[in-house]
Curated annotation (Swiss-Prot):
This is Bilin biosynthesis protein RpcF. It comes from Synechococcus sp. (strain WH8020). The lineage of its organism: Bacteria, Bacillati, Cyanobacteriota, Cyanophyceae, Synechococcales. The keyword Lyase applies. One of its GO terms (cellular component) is phycobilisome. PANTHER family: PBS LYASE HEAT DOMAIN PROTEIN REPEAT-CONTAINING PROTEIN (PTHR12697:SF38), PBS LYASE HEAT-LIKE PROTEIN (PTHR12697). InterPro entries: ARM-like, ARM-type_fold, PBS_lyase_HEAT. Belongs to the CpcE/RpcE/PecE family. An enzyme involved in the biosynthesis of bilin. Might be involved in the specific attachment of phycoerythrobilin (PEB) to the R-phycocyanin II alpha chain.
Length: 209
């Protein structure tokens, strides 16, 4: 292997790894190279049904930032929940506007609560500029508003965070609709106490800002 490049060595180690510790070590070595050429292998690691390996690979992809987005966008495996969850988490953390379509779709339709929660966080924090990106910001907010009745409280919690963030940072046309949504989530019609409290906190912060 003396004639191999560091990337080739790291890929060979990754492909030869048999145990979780070996896979983690090989994945970390790939991440440490900080090269876009490692992206396909890191994405492969997201689908191993091994959370420890996927977590390391996701961190490496996030560190590569927008360079990883095109490959992540085309790698979504609708049949592999684990891989899908990590891909959406990575895209949400990178915050690249090119992820908007995928995050919208994931929040609205994905069967996995963790995927919907990550999508909500991603829509809250995409790197968009107001007012230049007003139309995209409105899409993000509309997607969040549509998810306020999500069956899973962890998703509703992320939605509250997103709505509050949008109202504090921008001046959306449907601000009153957002306030009404938060009031609904803070009322007794919401069965989960932590959701009521989080919505009340959002309203208090918005009132004082």
């Amino acid at each position: 292997m003396n004639n191999l490049s560091p990337l080739e060595v790291a890929i060979a180690d990754f492909q030869a790894a048999k145990t979780t510790p070996e896979l983690i070590r090989a994945t970390k070595n790939l991440c440490d190279l900080r090269t876009i050429e490692a992206i396909p292998i890191l994405i492969e690691g997201l689908g191993f049904n091994n959370p420890a390996v996927a977590s390391v690979a996701t961190s490496g992809l996030i560190e590569l930032g927008s360079q990883a987005v095109p490959s992540l966008l085309v790698s979504l495996d609708e049949k592999n929940y684990g891989s899908r969850a990590w891909v959406v988490r990575a895209l949400a953390s990178i915050r690249d506007p090119r992820s908007l379509d995928l995050l919208e779709h994931a929040l609205a339709t994905d069967i996995a609560p963790s995927v919907r929660r990550s999508a909500a966080r991603g829509l809250a924090e995409l790197n968009l500029i107001y007012p230049e990106d007003r139309s995209k910001l409105e899409r993000c907010l509309l997607a969040l508003l549509a998810a306020i009745k999500d069956d899973e409280w962890v998703v509703r919690y992320a939605v509250i965070f997103g709505i509050e963030l949008h109202l504090r940072r921008y001046n959306p046309n449907n601000k009153n609709h957002c306030i009404l949504a938060l009031k609904q989530l803070s009322s007794d019609s919401e069965s989960i106490k932590v959701i009521r409290l989080r919505a009340k906190l959002a309203l208090q912060r918005l009132a004082s800002s």
